[in-house]
Amino acid sequence: MGLPGKNKGAVLSKIATNNQHGENSEYFDGWKAYDKDPFHLSRNPHGIIQMGLAENQLCLDLIKDWVKENPEASICTLEGIHQFSDIANFQDYHGLKKFRQAIAHFMGKARGGRVTFDPERVVMSGGATGANETIMFCLADPGDVFLIPSPYYAAFDRDLRWRTGVEIIPVPCSSSDNFKLTVDAAEWAYKKAQESNKKVKGLILTNPSNPLGTMLDKDTLTNLVRFVTRKNIHLVVDEIYAATVFAGGDFVSVAEVVNDVDISEVNVDLIHIVYSLSKDMGLPGFRVGIVYSFNDSVVSCARKMSSFGLVSSQTQLMLASMLSDDQFVDNFLMESSRRLGIRHKVFTTGIKKADIACLTSNAGLFAWMDLRHLLRDRNSFESEIELWHIIIDRVKLNVSPGSSFRCTEPGWFRICFANMDDDTLHVALGRIQDFVSKNKNKIVEKASENDQVIQNKSAKKLKWTQTNLRLSFRRLYEDGLSSPGIMSPHSPLLRA
């Protein structure tokens, strides 16, 4: 498929021809490989298993049961067809009132009932992808900068930058401190941006973190709220994994911090939340994204922009009924947390048998897997990509390399465990264990060689190497974004 003429770019816009969509990365290449050879237990048992999709399929049976028991919630049933004419007509772009009320109520429940949300501040969007872009259009102009702790969600370059012209500066976080974000690190990145004459408009967090599966504690979140208030920059918190916590305490929303912190220490007009039902409810196909802002002007602007990415009225109607069913919601959230905890334990126990460790986590639909000991060169991103190719081509697993998430240390991989049935997970774990077992001698020899190299390096040389890695990472960030192309309908480029 192509356009006539030799100079195809001449008839297209700058957005259509720029290199900022982000499709040409290993994160998306893994999806393309999977699309060509998808695993199936019986039809294609030697195919690639999809472990690059952060999708929550563990409780779809509960939703199916609710739909069967509540046929009146849909206009596509005999019990609900009487609502068809009303729902089929144009609706308020702000959304059905009962839908916004139900969403606000559910957001409170997903955060343990410790905070309430105002339905009038709920703005709809087509998934979290649309919500993230909408908030960027509301807050920033082309060339403005947002700081984001790295590693961060691989598709943020698309969601936040591609059409808005906003720039991202990573806030590097280290494995030596379990990739924890500190105010000092944010301050460092802020100063670096200023030294480059960049206008910093805000800080973006994912909490719980994608890809780490960790949560920010209340003290850290409070200090970051104070930080953005001092700098007079925005704080956008992506909380789409709020209800995926399965251990280690309660999730703390930035809304809870706003309620508890002294009013003199926070400018609430700077605080914004992105949410969706894709992860917590396992409904990415419903395309329900939410912008929730404490700033009246942002709410007003986002409402106007929502006309470009509405949630269908039919979807709103059914979800308004489902999310208003307190008994169902309470049971769903409890059971989802329980099943995620079991699945996480099964996965981490399975890879531990292969002498593979993960970052300690308690939320999300994935694990941050440490494969540094399998690298040919532990200081090389090239070695990381070599290993990734082996995992894709030989082990037949689509996992995502850390460099796709702008991690500054080679050898970390995100691997998703909630998007498959138990039998498929068993096959995936078997493949991992078999691969490590067959290559164990090579791994031991490689580790010995790496240890000797490290011992021979001075502290000064190590410091230089770490700095050089960050510079290499920056070049990777600037050069590794590709022009858009024609995408598979199953591509994550089209998903939240």
Curated annotation (Swiss-Prot):
Sites binding substrate sit at 55, 93
**Superkingdom of origin:** Eukaryota
Recorded GO molecular functions are: 1-aminocyclopropane-1-carboxylate synthase activity; pyridoxal phosphate binding
Write the Enzyme Commission number(s) for this entry.
Answer: 4.4.1.14
Name one matching Pfam family: Aminotran_1_2
Tell me which Gene Ontology terms the entry assigns under biological process: ethylene biosynthetic process; fruit ripening
This protein is called what?
1-aminocyclopropane-1-carboxylate synthase 2
- Provide the species name: Arabidopsis thaliana
